[in-house]
């Protein structure tokens, strides 16, 4: 029974943490269709991704401290319910401006799933057991980038981009029911913040904590590289290389497997190696891969070199995401909601600001996308190493 309960908790938290991938990856094969249907530009279509990412980021700033004060369960129910409702409303949208606003609101609701899945995990685990649980959680999270674009490509084949939001709404309703009937409160009243104001104050203290921020900002920029890839890959493979939505979805799914492998390997390595060392290697690996890929594309290579480079980059991101999250949450166990909120804010805000740059720097070449990924990886590396040396 205990094993079954743990499996259910793991799967539920993994799905809740995947609101970002669910909201982006299922939607990616539909971007060209959406652009044509709403008579808009590539950059405005990509802005709908940015809006959702910013909603995910800003929402976490409020949900995290509120959950430290009032517990995890009710903020989670309200947020996921709001996500489901907004998804259904988006189905009737006819203008890109309305879609962008609603995507922001959808992100606000989905932020509860992202921030509270990490907080609930920290309520239940600590130390290396948290690292192992996070590796499992991130592996489940990573399954969605595999399934979602394939499913999205299939939906586009039979319906249109609105059908994807109908499905997202249904998923939201199912998760509300799962939380309502299967998830108990994990933060006892004795461990909650004295007031909401005190919870926000604690989050402010985290911003000034270099030991925490080196993980939050370092991870944020590395994940920024992933969001640049998410925003640009649909147009690169479908419009530059003229692949079908289904073939693009297949390539994207293969990279999703690479993300799962990167996350999963951490759970095995952490038994013999320190998490700090694993994180350092993961960041350096990402910088090296994107640097070499940028150079090769500038010199002129084919689609297969790009595919291999992206596969390796995403593997490194899986390593960084898992270890940085575990290290940051371990360091701030008594402020789990605020710590999780800042991690989410960093990832989604940086990703949200980076994604429109892909369209602005040109949609007729893959080079801007890869150079932006390399830049994000380098900044993440510099922030992590800079903070580490300062704190030594």
Give residue ranges: language-model regions.
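Cytoplasmic helix-loop-helix junction between adjacent transmembrane helices
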Residues: 102-143
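Helix-breaking motifs and short loop linkers at transmembrane-helix boundaries and internal kinks
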Residues: 37-39, 71, 92-98, 109, ...
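Juxtamembrane intracellular "pre-TM" segments in multi-pass secondary transporters
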Residues: 2, 186-216
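Conserved MFS/SLC helix-loop-helix module at the cytosolic interface between two early adjacent transmembrane helices
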Residues: 58-97
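Helix-loop-helix hairpin linking two adjacent transmembrane segments in secondary transporters
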Residues: 98, 135-181, 250
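C-terminal transmembrane helical hairpin of 12-TM major facilitator-type secondary transporters
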Residues: 277-323
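Helix-to-loop junctions at the C-terminal end of transmembrane segments
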Residues: 60-71, 262-276
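Paired small-residue
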Residues: 82-89, 97-105, 304-312
């Amino acid at each position: 029974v205990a094993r079954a309960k743990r499996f259910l908790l793991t799967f539920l938290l993994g799905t809740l943490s995947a609101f970002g991938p669910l909201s982006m990856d299922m939607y990616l094969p539909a971007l060209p269709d959406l652009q044509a249907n709403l008579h808009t530009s590539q950059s405005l279509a990509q802005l709908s991704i940015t809006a959702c990412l910013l909603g995910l980021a800003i929402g976490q700033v409020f949900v995290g401290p509120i959950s430290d004060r009032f517990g995890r369960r009710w903020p989670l129910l309200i947020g996921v319910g709001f996500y489901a409702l907004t998804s259904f409303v988006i189905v009737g949208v006819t203008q890109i401006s309305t879609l962008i606003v609603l995507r922001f609101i959808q992100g606000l609701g989905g932020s509860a799933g992202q921030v509270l899945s990490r907080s609930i995990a920290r309520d239940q685990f600590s130390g290396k057991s948290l690292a192992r649980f996070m590796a499992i959680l991130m592996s489940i999270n990573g399954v969605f980038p595999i399934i979602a674009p394939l499913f999205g490509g299939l939906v586009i084949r039979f319906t249109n981009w609105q059908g994807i939001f109908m499905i997202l709404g249904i998923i939201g309703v199912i998760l509300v029911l799962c939380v309502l009937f299967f998830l108990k409160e994990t933060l006892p009243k004795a461990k909650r913040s004295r007031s909401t104001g005190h919870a926000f104050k604690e989050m402010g203290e985290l911003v000034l904590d270099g030991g925490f921020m080196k993980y939050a900002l370092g991870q944020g920029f590395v994940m920024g590289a992933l969001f640049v890839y998410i925003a640009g890959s649909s147009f690169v493979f479908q419009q530059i290389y003229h692949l079908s939505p289904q073939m693009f979805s297949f390539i994207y799914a293969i990279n999703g497997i690479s993300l799962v492998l990167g996350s999963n390997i951490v759970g095995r390595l952490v038994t013999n190696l320190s998490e700090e060392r694993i994180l350092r290697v993961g960041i350096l690996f990402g910088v090296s891969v994107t640097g070499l890929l940028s150079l090769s594309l500038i010199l002129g290579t084919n689609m297969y070199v790009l595919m291999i480079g992206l596969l390796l980059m995403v593997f490194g991101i899986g390593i960084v995401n898992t270890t940085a999250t575990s290290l940051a949450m371990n360091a701030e166990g008594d402020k789990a909601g605020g710590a999780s909120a800042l991690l989410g804010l960093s990832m989604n805000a940086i990703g949200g600001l980076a994604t429109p740059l892909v369209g602005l720097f040109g949609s007729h070449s893959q080079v801007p996308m890869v150079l932006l990924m390399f830049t994000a990886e380098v900044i993440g590396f510099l922030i992590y190493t800079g903070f580490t040396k300062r704190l030594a």
